Amino acid sequence: RSPSRGLGDVYKRQEVNRMDFHPKDLKSDEHRSRHPLGRIPVLDDGDIRIYESGAIVEYVLERHKKGNLKPDVSNDNYPEYLQWFHYCEGMVMPPINTIIVQTLLLPEERRDENVLNQARKLLSKSLEPVNQALEGREYLIGNFSAADIMLGHACFMSNRLGCVNEEMLNMKSYVENINKRPAFQIAISMS
């Protein structure tokens, strides 16, 4: 999960530290010095280090104030923006994380097909409100926003994991729109 998938829209001076998405690399002493739980992402900006996805996006938005990716609190779209900004980490990422653990990180003998199937169903169910919200819209609140930075990559991953069903036409279009963004294409090519 990587907010950097969309941060190229705001944060031009980024340097990407690539690493293998493997427990031995994530749990290495070197990486744990950056993130105490051995997870990703991590943002270093001078002497500042942040390792929570939403906090990274909010920090970059406030610190670098480029673009119009966050509506003002007085804007009618602000409550909806806030909803979708936080929906990613609260509702969509937990089942994605379970799917990744069950299919990539755990040794085969420790994987549980029931847990995997339950996570897939939960993910599809969690995406239904997003699909409904996208009716008649290109992006979550109309124009591209930081809510799309947070949720767009999760929807892209959900689609790749086979959890965006064929009836979710709005979601399919949304994933295509996210995938067409130059910053997203650059970030995907680096991963």
Where are each of the predicted segments found?
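Single conserved hydrophobic/aromatic residue that forms the stacking wall/gate
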Residues: 1-7, 11
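Residue-level signal for nonpolar/aromatic packing positions in well-ordered secondary structure
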Residues: 9, 43, 56, 130, ...
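Short, structured active-site "lid" loops
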Residues: 15, 31-60
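A short beta-strand-loop structural module common to alpha/beta enzyme folds
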Residues: 13-26
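GST-like fold's C-terminal all-alpha helical module
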Residues: 85-180
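Active-site catalytic microenvironments for nucleophilic, acid-base chemistry
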Residues: 12, 59-63, 157-161
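Short clusters of hydrophobic/aromatic residues that line enzyme substrate/ligand-binding pockets
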Residues: 31, 69-71, 139-140
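Helix-adjacent hinge/juxtasegments
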Residues: 57-78, 84-86
